[in-house]
Amino acid sequence: MMGTKHRNSHVNGSIKSSSSLRSSSKSFQAKMDLMSERLYDVVKSGSMVKRAQNKKRFTPVNYKHRWFELTKRTFSYFDVENVERRRERGRIHLKGVRLVEEATVSGEGGDPFAPDGYPFQVGYCEISASANSHQLENGNGGGSGVGIEGQQSGRAVPQYTLYVIANSEKERSEWIRAIRQVCEDSNTPKSYRYHPGLWSGKKWSCCKGLSRTTFGCRAAAHWREANNNPSNGSSPAQNSTRSISPNSSTTNSQFSLQHNSSGSLGGGVGGGLGGGGSLGLGGGGGGGGSCTPTSLQPQSSLTTFKQSPTLLNGNGTLLDANMPGGIPTPGTPNSKAKDNSHFVKLVVALYPFKAIEGGDLSLEKNAEYEVIDDSQEHWWKVKDALGNVGYIPSNYVKPKALLGLERYEWYVGDMSRQRAESLLKQGDKEGCFVVRKSSTKGLYTLSLHTKVPQSHVKHYHIKQNARCEYYLSEKHCCETIPDLINYHRHNSGGLACRLKSSPCDRPVPPTAGLSHDKWEIHPMELMLMEELGSGQFGVVRRGKWRGSIDTAVKMMKEGTMSEDDFIEEAKVMTKLQHPNLVQLYGVCSKHRPIYIVTEYMKHGSLLNYLRRHEKTLIGNMGLLLDMCIQVSKGMTYLERHNYIHRDLAARNCLVGSENVVKVADFGLARYVLDDQYTSSGGTKFPIKWAPPEVLNYTRFSSKSDVWAYGVLMWEIFTCGKMPYGRLKNTEVVERVQRGIILEKPKSCAKEIYDVMKLCWSHGPEERPAFRVLMDQLALVAQTLTD
């Protein structure tokens, strides 16, 4: 007996070992497949922001930068750091994708935590990685279905929506097109209606529907059916769907099941859609049914897809995933859902715009316009109420669906606490106020200037109660922030004084170029005025383009730059646009000297501004830190677009109205012809802002810009002192190579100096990216100032 038991134990051990080896082999093979897929099968990749999907009920909503990769099988996302060994954070199998559409995550009723950007959504069902994809393709039924949790009849099959925020309109369009194309090639089933907004826990932000299962309020874009053959004389619907009579015993509602021609409904439908039914619905009967992925399609060819579930009633009947009780009975309100298949995109003008060039269209503030073509990032073709058509700057308008507080003069968006205080103190008016985004993400703050008991600015967090009402004092609650502001215009209600006026009209932002597709400017269009300064490249004068737009005109010295190369680059640089970058309008290249025409910044260079206002700035750590953050935002944009500045310093940043700081002259150093400027031995080279790899090998990168940014921070917190004092360049080079860094400025907090030291890490790979610096400094600002 003992021997038998021992032998059995030995055999069992062998079986376990064999099983373990097979499992290990499968795991290894899966890793190899993943590696192969990433190396050879990547269709598109890039960095974007991902919104948490909150599959678990009580997990918090957050947004994180991720590296996304689209292959022919999956849409995956990874940690953004450690490029060579990124850790995968999640993936969506494209067999499970049901829709890819633009989304609205911010604005009225949206997520106040949402970062700026261009969101889109990917609606999908969860599909397992290996065997289930085979089942999907071959229609093998059984068990729990196709990797989606098999459910007993009457229970829900989980469906999810991934929200991703792209960096530009163009990038979003490219991602949507790419994902749809791969899904089309794979014959994945589609959803026909969807919600463009978010479910807030109480209602949809888009249509205000009060049920999470409310029918989708917008028609999804049409996807071509890759397996349709127009030559056979039948319609796509005939090829791709099998209708089920509303009078049959199978269903009480009208719907179609979209399916793959190689699969059969079999026991899936005949047996009440059991475990082998379509999408793996059910769990008991119908084991031999098809597992071909299907999407519910009402006979109006409209369906929706969101995080709401696909349902089965107690009889095994399929119900519409997004409608309580299934497809609506004719005559009910839901049955009259409007078909928005021809969706009209409306925008509202935030600023006035005067059309000067032919083909452009003037904008009237607060007027609505219909978008005809938004394929270009910075100039859209629109139609006004009178039917006039032309191009307008896209940053002057906001989609009506996204329009929130931007329509109000008192809303200043991302303005910091320090800039708000500076702005409100300028007018010195009692009751002057602004509403801004709080440093605490997702909240808003009211900043109010009062003279009681003396002139100062008070800040009040706008809070929400359990009923989602807004208040400054719990005794006075309102449904919306505008209602709250209106109330406190007439009643102080616990504030230091009544709200009376906002400071002034918002400054009109610059456009990407002076007109649609215009980058070459004729010198006769410019009226040159006073000299603003001079530098390495020549004299800078103030100018006016066609007598209406203030500009700065850089008159380049002949022989100082590679002109032909720069002119080509200028075509691209006019399309770079960010609130913290000085806008390049265009060039005058048809005569010599060349003119470079840029946005005019009334307070001039940051270096001179710091030195002029040292007495008022040196003790205002919050305002100095805000300047650093603004520069980091502009540099984050350049970093994302693979632009290297090469000469980042306080002298190459400019200051405009409302203490706005912008980065100037980005990329210009690349076109300098002076050899001394690009060698470590010359006096003109910005050695005191250069890292070791630039001093030793002239090796520029985004990380060399990070080093220079650390020096710029030091300049800001010393109010324009020269780095390394009177040390000669050779002495500076020696110190940098030995790892000796600049000392902490007296007015600088330790937390801020710690960020500077990170920028001065000896190896470029050890320095943080600008987007990381931006987040770190924002956190420091919140800790030190709010």
Curated annotation (Swiss-Prot):
Phosphotyrosine PTM positions read Y677
Gene3D superfamilies, per the entry = Pleckstrin-homology domain (PH domain)/Phosphotyrosine-binding domain (PTB), SH2 domain, SH3 Domains, Transferase(Phosphotransferase) domain 1
Q: Which PROSITE patterns is this protein grouped with? A: PH_DOMAIN, PROTEIN_KINASE_ATP, PROTEIN_KINASE_DOM, PROTEIN_KINASE_TYR, SH2, SH3, ZF_BTK
Broadest EC class assigned to this enzyme? transferase
Q: In which residue ranges is the amino acid composition biased (Low complexity)? A: 14-23, 226-240
Instruction: State where ATP binds.
Output: L532, G533, S534, G535, Q536, F537, G538, V539, V540, K554
Q: Mark the Btk-type zinc finger spans by residue number.
A: 187-223
| Keyword Membrane set for record | no
> What are the PH domain coordinates in residue numbering?
41-184
- Specify the Protein kinase domain's residue ranges: 526-779
Indicate the segments forming the SH3 domain, all copies.
342-402
So which domain of life are we looking at?
Eukaryota
- Tissue specificity statement from the Swiss-Prot or TrEMBL entry: Ring canals in the egg chambers and imaginal disks of third-instar larvae.
Positions of the region Disordered? Answer: 1-23, 226-301
**The keyword Nucleus appears for this protein:** no
What's the cofactor? Zn(2+)
Q: What does it do?
A: Required for proper ring canal development. Also required for the development of male genitalia and for adult survival.
Q: What is this protein called?
A: Tyrosine-protein kinase Btk
The upper taxonomy is:
Eukaryota, Metazoa, Ecdysozoa, Arthropoda, Hexapoda
Q: Which gene encodes it?
A: Btk
